[in-house]
Regions:
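Non-catalytic alpha-helical scaffolds and adjoining flexible linkers that form interface surfaces
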Residues: 1-26, 30-268
């Protein structure tokens, strides 16, 4: 009986590669059925290697591997086609998605809904005009946070469980969700006066750490509605704060590149 734990013909994408020894690479893979997996592609850096042109990001593949350790061995890769590779700014957005998943996904945890969302997002980035990229990225960020268990609910108040109201302002806290801001709020950080617990603000104390956001935007996020311009404007700092909370101190490299690219393209 075979004991090498062979996995065959799994749909997946390469998120990132780095050199391994003289002629090989380690490929960080996101597969539909097995989640994130690290695979050694032996000889993939040789000019004549059949893997050389396949072990690339944004290429839909059928992957086969074996091994019992965390670092497994790739023994087959087949191009599936059917996906237009992103170009230009869309390509940078694609690398941003890959870096997010490398940083936030644990190895070996399957996320089939996230995989499907990733394929859809790559397709949309390749086909959409640049003015749609913000909407596309915010939707994927939300899906990633929910699928990995990092995002609390958007349409229910933390603590009370009451439905968020569009006309009210909230402070969204990572790991907790939205807290209603005070009706006489002096700024976006003042907490509702009847709140108690570690996030309660009284006297001159600062309110709960979080991001000020309208109830309307929270309801739109819960409904996966990113068509409203105000929702897009408020969703960006909210998603960034949530992602940064879980990333820790190390910033995203691709986010900085996207920022610099935007600045270069702005009229002077």
């Amino acid at each position: 009986m075979s004991t090498d734990h062979r996995i065959n013909n799994q749909a997946g994408f390469i998120l990132h590669t780095y050199p391994f020894k003289e002629t090989s690479v380690v490929a960080e893979v996101f597969s539909r059925e097995h989640g994130r997996v690290a695979l050694i592609a032996r000889g993939a850096r040789r000019p004549a290697s059949a893997l050389r042109g396949l072990v690339q990001p944004f290429t839909p593949l059928l992957l086969s591997w074996f091994g019992k350790s965390e670092l497994k061995t790739l023994h087959g890769a087949e191009w599936q086609g059917g996906l237009i590779a992103p170009q230009g700014r869309a390509l940078m957005c694609g690398f941003y998605l890959n870096e997010l998943m490398l940083r936030l996904l644990a190895r070996g945890d399957a996320h089939q809904a996230l995989y499907d969302a990733y394929v859809l997002t790559l397709t949309q980035l390749a086909e959409a005009s640049p003015d749609m990229f913000e909407q596309i990225l915010r939707r994927f960020e939300k899906t990633l946070l929910i699928e990995t268990g990092y995002a609390a609910t958007f349409d229910k108040e933390a603590g009370s469980g009451e439905t968020v109201r569009a006309e009210w302002t909230y402070v969204y806290q990572p790991e907790r969700g939205p807290w209603r801001a005070a009706e006489d709020q002096r700024g976006p950080w003042r907490a509702k006066e009847d709140q108690r617990g570690p996030w309660h603000a009284n006297g001159n104390a600062r309110g709960p750490e979080g991001v000020s956001v309208s109830g309307k935007t929270l309801l739109h996020l819960a409904a996966d509605n990113f068509d409203d311009l105000t929702t897009l404007a408020e969703a960006k700092p909210l998603m960034r704060a949530l992602i940064n909370h879980y990333l820790g101190a190390k910033p995203l490299y691709t986010r900085q590149l996207l920022r610099e690219l935007t600045e270069l393209n702005e009229p002077t």
